[in-house]
């Protein structure tokens, strides 16, 4: 059963990252990225198990129901690596707002135009990222670090939503994002 949208509403409000938050995000990410393949797969499997409607955008594995089978999917692993590399680029670029904007713009455009992904899934994915990282890295994802990540993911969601709006995304008025 899919969760209610309200669980990720805190991702609709963002503010600029502080220097301290940037450092916490980059330090924590360095630890997570050491296991980027496993972390990425865990994130996507959790997304697809808890929010099965998110699989509709992936013809290669949208009919796979079993979590273990999803984990073994080479296509899922490939996409998980792409997601983790995009997050890595974002985190590495936190000191360069132009680069951050460029990355988020490219991701937003690709998902709106080419993949036609409803922008609400960025909020959902962000919530899943926070959940999985908190469970997998409890010593790293302290409350303060999780708060910094929440702010970064809110920036991501707001920026991508702005890209969708700029493109005149036809479903935005119907979306809960």
Curated annotation (Swiss-Prot):
Q: Which Gene3D superfamilies match?
A: Globins
What broad class of enzyme is this?
oxidoreductase
Q: Which InterPro entries match?
A: Globin (IPR000971), Globin-like_sf (IPR009050), Globin/Proto (IPR012292), Globin_lamprey/hagfish (IPR013314)
Q: Which Pfam families match?
A: Globin
Provide the disulphide bond pattern: none
Top-level taxon of origin: Eukaryota
Provide the binding site for heme b: 79, 111
Print the keywords alphabetically: Cytoplasm, Heme, Iron, Metal-binding, Nucleus, Oxidoreductase
EC number(s): the record gives 1.14.12.-, 1.7.-.-, 1.11.1.-, 1.15.1.1
Recorded GO cellular component terms are: cytoplasm; nucleus
Primary location group: cytoplasm
Where, per UniProt, does this protein localize?
Cytoplasm; Nucleus
GO MF annotation, one: superoxide dismutase activity
Start and end of every Globin domain? 16-165
Function description: Probable multifunctional globin with a hexacoordinated heme iron required for the catalysis of various reactions depending on redox condition of the cell as well as oxygen availability. Has a nitric oxide dioxygenase (NOD) activity and is most probably involved in cell-mediated and oxygen-dependent nitric oxide consumption. Under normoxic conditions functions as a nitric oxide dioxygenase (NOD) but under hypoxic conditions the globin may switch its function to that of a nitrite (NO2) reductase (NiR), generating nitric oxide.
Q: How does it assemble?
A: Monomeric.
Q: Kindly provide the name given to this protein in its UniProt entry.
A: Cytoglobin-1
Q: Which organism is it from?
A: Oryzias latipes
Q: Which gene encodes it?
A: cygb1
């Amino acid at each position: 059963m899919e969760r209610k949208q309200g669980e990720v509403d805190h991702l609709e409000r963002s503010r600029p990252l502080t220097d301290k938050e940037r450092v916490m995000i980059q330090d924590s990410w360095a630890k997570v990225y050491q296991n980027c393949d496993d972390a990425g797969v865990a994130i996507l499997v959790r997304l697809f198990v808890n929010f099965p409607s998110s699989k509709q955008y992936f013809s290669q594995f949208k009919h796979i129901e079993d979590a273990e089978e999803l984990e073994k999917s080479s296509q899922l692993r490939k996409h998980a690596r792409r997601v983790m590399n995009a997050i890595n680029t974002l985190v590495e670029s936190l000191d360069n707002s132009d680069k951050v904007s460029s990355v988020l713009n490219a991701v937003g455009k690709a998902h709106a135009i080419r993949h036609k992904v409803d922008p609400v899934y960025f909020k959902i994915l962000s919530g899943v990222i926070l959940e999985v990282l908190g469970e997998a890295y409890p010593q790293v994802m302290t409350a303060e670090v999780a708060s910094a990540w929440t702010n970064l993911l809110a920036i991501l969601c707001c920026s991508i939503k702005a890209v969708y709006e700029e493109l005149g995304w036809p479903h935005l008025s119907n979306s809960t994002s």
